[in-house]
Amino acid sequence: MSKSESPKEPEQLRKLFIGGLSFETTDESLRSHFEQWGTLTDCVVMRDPNTKRSRGFGFVTYATVEKVDAAMNARPHKVDGRVVEPKRAVSREDSQRPGAHLTVKKIFVGGIKEDTEEHHLRDYFEQYGKIEVIEIMTDRGSGKKRGFAFVTFDDHNSVDKIVIQKYHTVNGHNCEVRKALSKQEMASASSSQRGRSGSGNFGGGRGGGFGGNDNFGRGGNFSGRGGFGGSRGGGGYGGSGDGYNGFGNDGSNFGGGGSYNDFGNYNNQSSNFGPMKGGNFGGRSLGPYGGGGQYFAKPRNQGGYGGSSSSSSYGSGRRF
C-alpha cells in the first residue's frame, strides 16, 4: 500500500487551515490549487450548516508532512483571485489555549537546564526555520540563569510547526515550548474569542470541531488583573505585576511568590501555571509542566487571522 493511501504521520501534522477564502471558492477549486504541492487526503470549505454559504475558510490535508512544508514554502497563495492565509491547523484540545490562533514568531522555552547554552537551543530549533534571536534569561542581580529562554524566528510558520509537536528535547532534557505572547496580544486574543471574530484555525476531525468557551481555557478571561492564574490557582501569571510580564521586569516572579529559577522545578506556593487544567508548573500530571499556559514576552506587532471573510461564529461547540 502506498504512503499516500496509508498515511503514517499524524493527521494533525498534515493539515492546514486556509483562511481568507473567497466566498466563491469551492472544495474543488481549493483542491485544484493546493494539490499542486502534493496529494491531498482531504479538502473542505467550511459552510454554514443552514444556508450552505461559505464561512470564508477551509482545511486541506496532505498525505505527508513533507508536502505541507512544500505548500507553506510556496507562500503567498492565491485561490480564485484572492490571496489566502494558510496556517498549521490547531487541534481542538490546543485551540482552548489562550493565543493558540495568534500569528507570532517567538516561542517561550521553559525547563532548560543550567548548563544549556545558546548553541544548544540553536542546534535544536534551527531545524524548524531561520532563527533571528535567542535570549536565555538570567537574574539581573546574580546573573544566574532562570531556566527559560525565548527564541525568535523569521516566520510564524516555524513557531506553528514547533508548538504542534508535544515533546521537545534540548541538551538532553525535555522542555516546555509555547508561543510567547505580549500582554497586549493576550488581551486581544481574549477579546476576539469573546467577540467571535473568527480568529481561529481549529482542525479536528474532517473539517474541524469548533468547540470552546467564551474565554480561553478554563480560568476565566486573561485580559485583566492577575489574568493568568487559572481557576484553581492563587497567583496570576503576568497580570498586574506579580507575574512574569516581559523583559522590562526581569526581577519579577512567575506568579504566587516563587521565582522560576530551579530549571524545571517550579515548586512554590499557590501559583497555578496552567490555565487549562490547573497543574502546578513542574507538576504532578500532564507532563513536566502540568498545564496549557502561554507565556508573556516583549510586545510585538499583533498578528492572527481575523479577516472580514470569516465573521461567522467560531466556538459554537458544533461539528460541521
From Swiss-Prot:
Q: Which residue numbers mark the cross-link Glycyl lysine isopeptide (Lys-Gly) (interchain with G-Cter in SUMO) in this sequence?
A: K113
Note the InterPro entries from the entry: HnRNPA1/A2_C, hnRNPA1_RRM1, Nucleotide-bd_a/b_plait_sf, RBD_domain_sf, RRM_dom
Q: Which residues carry this modification: Dimethylated arginine?
A: R194, R206, R225
PTM Asymmetric dimethylarginine: at which residues? R194, R206, R218, R225, R232
- Alphabetic keyword roster: Acetylation, Cytoplasm, Isopeptide bond, Methylation, mRNA processing, mRNA splicing, mRNA transport, Nucleus, Phosphoprotein, Repeat, Ribonucleoprotein, RNA-binding, Spliceosome, Transport, Ubl conjugation
Q: How is it modified after translation?
A: Sumoylated.
Q: Where does the protein end up?
A: Nucleus; Cytoplasm
One Pfam family it belongs to:
RRM_1
List every position bearing N6-acetyllysine: K3, K298
Q: Care to name a GO molecular-function term for this sequence?
A: miRNA binding
User: Primary place of residence?
Assistant: nucleus
Q: Which residues form the RRM domain?
A: 14-97, 105-184
Q: Where is this cross-link: Glycyl lysine isopeptide (Lys-Gly) (interchain with G-Cter in SUMO2)?
A: K3, K8, K78, K179, K183, K298
Region RNA-binding RGG-box: which residues?
Answer: 218-240
Query: Residues where N-acetylserine occurs?
Result: S2
A GO cellular-component term linked to this record: catalytic step 2 spliceosome
Q: Which residues carry this modification: N-acetylmethionine?
A: M1
Which region ranges are annotated with the description Nuclear targeting sequence? 268-305
Q: Which GO terms describe its biological process?
A: cellular response to sodium arsenite; mRNA splicing, via spliceosome; mRNA transport
Compositionally biased region (Gly residues): 197-216, 277-294
Q: List residues modified as Phosphoserine.
A: S2, S4, S6, S22, S192, S199, S285, S309, S310, S311, S312, S313, S316
Q: Where is this region: Globular B domain?
A: 95-185
| Renumbered residue ranges of the record's region Disordered | 182-216, 277-320
Segments of skewed composition (Low complexity): 308-320
Its assembly, as annotated, is: Identified in the spliceosome C complex. Identified in a IGF2BP1-dependent mRNP granule complex containing untranslated mRNAs. Interacts with SEPT6, C9orf72, KHDRBS1, UBQLN2. Interacts with PPIA/CYPA.
Task: Output this protein's name.
Answer: Heterogeneous nuclear ribonucleoprotein A1
